Each structure stands twice: as structure tokens, then as C-alpha cells.
Amino acid sequence: MQKIETFWYFCLKHFKQELNGQQFNTWIKPLKLEICPDVENTLVLIAPNRFVLQWIKDNFVNRIDEMAQGHFNEKIHFKLELKDPAEIKTATIKAPEPKSKEDKKPPTDKAHGTTARKTNPSRLNPAFTFDAFVTGKANQLARAGAIQVAERPGIAYNPLFIYGGVGLGKTHLMHAVGNYVMELDAGAKIRYVHAEKYVSDVVSAYQHKSFDKFKLYYHSLDLLLVDDVQFFSGKNRTQEEFFYAFNALIEAHKQVIITSDCYPKEISGLEERLVSRFGWGLTVAIEPPELEMRVAILLKKAFIEKIELDESTAFFIAKYIRSNVRELEGALKRVLAYSRFTGHPISLDLAKEALKDLLAIQNRQISIENIQKTVADYYKIKVADMYSKKRVRAIARPRQVAMAIAKELTQLSLPDIGEAFGGRDHTTVLHAHRKIVELRASDPGINRDYSTLIHILRG
């Protein structure tokens, strides 16, 4: 097999064109291809950890195999292996678990937590774990990145920057990393801090002339978790202190995880030197959950809370509550409260009754005409352009955005949506939706526009 280097170069080139940069750098670039010394006509695909290994196995190994059969003149077999033999050999997508029983901390007292957590200096929420986090297409990359960081803090991706709308699970993932690291090392110095609290700490240090104490604490952490960093906007002294803390931790190979409601470069009032450093590691987005994921979230929440919830009721709630996980869980609590108040078990009819006011508000506010006018005004085009046959990008792209939003926010069928856009067929609507999903993953500007329009329409 003299052409192995040529073959792997061909594979990398192919996947680089097919995937966006973030996906390619996370899943494909870390792979290595070698000839198996023990088995004839066999190539070994080496992954850096078990999560990349599982993802490649699920998504790309068959594709690579097909390309190999077309490249070589002989039948080629593939083996998947981990780079470090000491790592767990079984490819699984389960949440991280302690490496051995000896590594585990004593059982947690539910009333007080473990000895290390009685005062909870870390500010971690023990309920936010990887096991409690429901995974779907909207968040799988962010979860995979968080798990890799949890297993190799300070090494895998530093910093890890997670961005997305309110209530999508950014804080949950951040706490999950902290809880996992704490589970492995009860003595680890971990601090979760909301950006507003960090600002408050800076102000307090300024007032009491205690910056030495402030720096000693934040610069000595093993894991710093900063939530909603957009609140640093315009606060120059806070940004300066965080810049020093960030540098100190990164240089010491200590992990930093940051969340924001938008892409780092879109945070106004943030110093360029911070924006640049936020891009040193891995930046991942969390999108609003798709229908199947919303159903899974409801069923998991019901299981944890010991609530009887059948799939049809969960599907009904998930179908109409689409913005974020927080509102989804809020709707479930409302249904549960109504059930307890009336003394009737949770059912589809009860859920419809409990949520009728909420659903009426949503249905009244969002119509396809409202979507078309809002999108047209936003992009400064005519509403008539939504129905026209014009294909220039300045008109076609807003039209695709409007179709995608209509699919997400209304209950209209694809043919009905197409009819509302100048008699287009359902395949045009489906193509528009898929195109916008792709662009939101690769183009921060489109993602920002889409999120802003959703926010405007939902009021």
C-alpha cells in the first residue's frame, strides 16, 4: 500500500470541503491513518479519544471505507483505535465516569453533599451532570467538546467557549464539566461565577483595595467557569482583570470555560485582545432543540421528577413550546401544577387545557404574514419580494430566512408555506430551511439575524 499518504490527503481534502471548519477541526483533523503491522491489507484509523472514535464510527467510517475501495486496487479493511492505549477501549457515548472505584468520592449525602461540598465554594449545581443532559443535533458538538474538556482539563480545548440563546443548556454543560472534575478530584479548586458576580468582585476589590487577594484567588483556580461573558461589555477594569486571570490560568494549563449569548466577535464593547484569546480553544454553538430532542427532554425531566408523562402528551407540549429548554420545562411544571390543582392525572386533554392561554398567545402573535413583513422590514426589502420570482441574493436569502422561520414558528404544512410565498412547492421550502440551518452553523451573521428575528416575532 504505497499510496496511503495520497489516500489520506484525498480524504482530508474531501471532508474539508464537505464540513464546516469547526466540525473538520474537531472530528477529522485529529485523526491519524497508519498501516496495521500485524494484519495484511488493513489500515488503522487512530482517534485522540473515545468520543471522537465513537463519532467517526457512527458517521464517517463507512464513507472512508468506500473511498479506500475506490482508491486502492485491493480490498482494504479498517480498524478503529485510540491513540493512548491507557484510555478506555470501548467506544461509547455515555457520559464520563470515574476511571475506577478508587477514584470515586464517598457517596453523596443528599441533604448536605459531600464533605468537600458542604460550603460549596465552587458554586456548582450538583443536579447539572452529563447524565442529566439530553443530547441531540442542536447540542451534540458542544456536549462532545465539554466531555473532552472534562476528561482532559487544560489540555483538550482551552478555553472552551459555548454560545447560544437563553435556556438552551450552556450553563448546564458548564456545571457538568465542573461536577465531573470535582468527582475525580475533590481537592480541585473550581469556581463557577456569573459575569455579573465577577464584575461585583472586581468592584469590591477596588473599593477595599484588595486586588492582591482577588488575583491570588482567581489566578490559583484549577477550573474557572464564567457564565454570560457578554455582561463584561463596556466594563474596562473588569476586562483588564479577567485578561490577567485568563492568561495566568492558560499559561498554567488550567481550564477556562466561557459562555455567551452570541459569537465572541459579535459581543459589542469587548476588547479585541479578549475576543482573540476566546478563539484559542474550541468555540461551539448550541441551537434551539429540534422536536425529537424536546420530547426527550420532557420525558427525561418527568422521569427525574417521578412524573407520569406519556409520549403523546410530551409530543404535544414539545410541538408548541419550541424556543428553549427553560420554557419547555416551565410548560411541564404548569401542566403538573394544573394536574395537582384539579386532582386529575396528566393527559393530553389536561395538557391542552393547562396550556391553552399560552398557546393562544403564540398562535395569535405569529402568522405567516407577520413573519413576511417582519423579515422584509429587517432586511429593508418589499413584502412583495417575498412572493416574487426574483433570485438575486439580496432578496432570495431573506425569502429563505422567512420560509425557515415560518416552518419553525407556525403550524402550517410545507405546501401551505410554499403557497404563501408566491405559489412555491414544498421542496423549495424544505430546501430553504436546510440551507438556513447550514448557514447558521457556518455564518455568524446569518445566525445572528435569524435569532434576532425569532426574538422579535416572539415578543
From Swiss-Prot:
Main location as per UniProt: cytoplasm
GO cellular component: cytoplasm; plasma membrane
NCBIfam families in the record: DnaA
Name recorded for this polypeptide: Chromosomal replication initiator protein DnaA
Role this protein plays: Plays an essential role in the initiation and regulation of chromosomal replication. ATP-DnaA binds to the origin of replication (oriC) to initiate formation of the DNA replication initiation complex once per cell cycle. Binds the DnaA box (a 9 base pair repeat at the origin) and separates the double-stranded (ds)DNA. Forms a right-handed helical filament on oriC DNA; dsDNA binds to the exterior of the filament while single-stranded (ss)DNA is stabiized in the filament's interior.
Keyword list, A-Z: ATP-binding, Cytoplasm, DNA replication, DNA-binding, Lipid-binding, Nucleotide-binding
Oligomer status and interactors: Oligomerizes as a right-handed, spiral filament on DNA at oriC.
GO MF annotations in UniProt: ATP binding; ATP hydrolysis activity; DNA replication origin binding; lipid binding
Species name: Nitrosomonas eutropha (strain DSM 101675 / C91 / Nm57)
Gene designation per UniProt: dnaA
GO BP annotations, alphabetical order: DNA replication initiation; regulation of DNA replication
Binding site for ATP: 167, 169-171
Localization annotation: Cytoplasm
Region feature (Domain III, AAA+ region): 123-339
Region (Domain II): 74-122
Region (Domain IV, binds dsDNA): 340-459
Region Domain I, interacts with DnaA modulators, residue ranges: 1-74
Biased composition (Basic and acidic residues): 96-112
Span list, region Disordered: 91-123
Pfam family, any one: Bac_DnaA
Similarity-based family: Belongs to the DnaA family.
Domain text: Domain I is involved in oligomerization and binding regulators, domain II is flexibile and of varying length in different bacteria, domain III forms the AAA+ region, while domain IV binds dsDNA.
SUPFAM superfamilies xref list: P-loop containing nucleoside triphosphate hydrolases, TrpR-like
